[in-house]
From Swiss-Prot:
This is V-type ATP synthase subunit I 2. It is a multi-pass membrane protein. It comes from the Bacteria. It comes from Treponema pallidum (strain Nichols). It is found in: Cell membrane. Residues 101-121 are annotated as: Disordered. The keyword Aminoacyl-tRNA synthetase does not apply. One of its GO terms (molecular function) is ATPase binding. Keywords: Cell membrane, Hydrogen ion transport, Ion transport, Membrane, Transmembrane, Transmembrane helix, Transport. Its main location: membrane.
Amino acid sequence: MFRSQRMKFLELVVLERDVDRVLEYLGKTALVHLRLSAAARGSSSHCAQSKEYVGRLEEACKYLGVSGECAFSPGDSLPTEEDYTLAQQILAEVDALHAREREGDAPSVPRGKSSVAHDSANEEQFQGEKCALGSMRGPALCALLRRFALQERVHRTRDALESTRHTYRIAGWLPAHEAKDLVAGLDNVTTGRMAVRLFEPQELSFIRDGSEHVPVCYQHGRFVRSYERMVSSYGCPPYGLVDPTPFVAFSYALLFGIMFGDLGQGLLFFVLGLLLRTRRVRALNRWAHLDYVFLSVGFSSMVMGFLTGEFFAHGTLLAPLIRSVTALCGGVPRDHILHLMPSHGSLHTLMAFFGFTLFLGFVINSLGLIINIVNQVRLRHALQQCVQKRECADSSFFGTWLPLQCAYHFLEFHSGSLMRLQWACLSWVFFVKSFWSVCASVCVRGFLKVLACI
């Protein structure tokens, strides 16, 4: 969960007669990240023919008013000879109707005569024929368009593969745990007419010399997967390192609830997440991948809003409900479970919650530092990480803050000199941070100079 999936490099050699079906199978499984040739060949005659059919079928769909969306389904396959025959037949019917319509648009009008009624009758006749042809041929036309569009993509990919006269070489990355099933499926497609090898990343020269990098593939649940784009917008972690996405998903939802705790506003976010999840509103489908983001932040905000008694910024609307809940739990009926607004007797709760948020920030920052250190160790930059001034300064800052805050709260309970000790703690922490920053900078520069001399 906290690391990317282990990858393997697939090298597959197939015959020319099997390459189209192999590429179709790989596309439907969506498991292989193909490594295409840098010097791709020009478009082949097969690709040009498929592109021509796709263009003509799209024009036919547009002429007949048929929705020709190329949303591929698992049942789509490459066109057969029957599909070619049917496509030619439908295109011939559309071309004939279009030719008749063009001839009817330019009639010969005798001098002194009007042809408005005649043109109107012809137009209605052609519109009726187009509607009839679209209703009869529409489903078949859409299916043919998807099949020929699939064939065009297969041919375009095939033109970018390394090949000899009779064979094609397909190379790419796939998750290691999917390799066995994929090879078995390829063997079934080609009936054994193939040669396949699997490599570990360290066995490849272009990975060892750093000219290419292993692609990263994650296997997250639905909740964490919805945060993947948020993390990847800052950059994708390299292969083999700790994946921060689960930490981001948990901390983001938690902090959102703490900062924007409101039962009413959280309910709106939660309902929006449900709409994205069910895909009932077509206009929101482009953001459907954020369904669990809105569900999680909405739920977190609702919980925090219930604890503080906030409902659309009103602090009294939930008071009767919270009194019933607190009385049911065996306590004294209260208007707020967490009363954070300034009032008599609420200062202690406010400071306790403030300390909780500081501790939570300390934990999140410490996790970030630990993840960074682990990643640097895996990248074999451990020595550089140990003497890096920023990490030393941040580690000393957070490492000093926690024991000092614990001592502060302990002495707060036993003595009255609170303000002086608080300022002393903060001054000491910031002094240590600045001192460590300067010392670490000097140590790093000196150490690097010594290494350069050696």
